[in-house]
Curated annotation (Swiss-Prot):
Active site: 83 (proton acceptor)
Enzyme class: transferase
UniProt keyword list: Acyltransferase, Transferase
Residues that hold substrate according to the record: 15-20
Induction: Up-regulated by biotic and chemical treatments.
Family from the record: Belongs to the gamma-glutamylcyclotransferase family.
Position of the signal peptide: none
A GO CC annotation given for this chain: plasma membrane
Protein task: Putative gamma-glutamylcyclotransferase.
Protein's UniProt name: Protein AIG2 B
EC numbers, comma separated: 2.3.2.-
GO MF terms, alphabetically ordered: acyltransferase activity; protein domain specific binding
Tissues where the protein occurs: Expressed in roots, leaves and stems.
Gene: AIG2B
Length: 169
């Protein structure tokens, strides 16, 4: 591997909460360039009891989202960690909204396409109005944990992305 290979950047198609600049800036610790794009052949679902969206293949599906361009390996690792094992990062083809150019990018697809918790259609504006603050709080805690785990497990922080996590009596 040459030194130039190490500096390859990543382009990632995002949908759901990662379309919100304040969320992306927090997770990536920078303000990446965001380019509007569409992903054909997928549907963006709600997840029962969760604050975030997921996508799964759907023959006639169309998702409007954004491409985060020029991400570093470290930034991609942040996305991988926050998405966790319930998502699979895969290469897809998107169409740039402004130019109709096709582009190969990576995105996060829900690993269990038959998950009974998938339903309906996730709504960005509704999420922004009702859940964004809680999601930003959870993301902040996750980034703090990544920097200093202090013996705590990732699972302790996963509960923050639930709409109404169980509480102790």
């Amino acid at each position: 591997m040459t030194s130039s290979d190490k500096s390859l950047s990543h382009d990632v198609f995002v949908y759901g909460s990662f379309q919100e600049p304040s969320v992306v800036n927090l997770i990536l610790e920078c303000s990446p360039v965001m380019v509007p794009a569409q992903l054909h052949g997928y549907h963006v679902y709600r997840l029962k009891g969760r604050l975030h969206a997921c996508i799964s293949p759907s023959e006639n599906g169309l998702i409007n989202g954004k491409i985060l361009t020029g991400l570093t390996d470290s930034q991609l690792e942040n996305l991988d960690m926050i998405e966790g094992s319930e998502y699979v990062r895969k290469t897809v083809e998107v169409v740039l909204t402004d130019t109709s150019e096709k582009k190969q990018v990576e995105t996060y697809v829900w690993a269990n396409k038959d998950d009974p918790n998938l339903y309906g259609e996730w709504d960005f504006e509704e999420w922004r109005r009702l859940h964004m603050d809680k999601f930003i709080e959870a993301s902040t805690k996750f980034i703090e944990w990544k920097k200093n785990p202090d013996g705590r497990s990732r699972e302790e922080f996963e509960k923050f992305v639930f709409d109404d996590p169980p509480t102790a009596a």
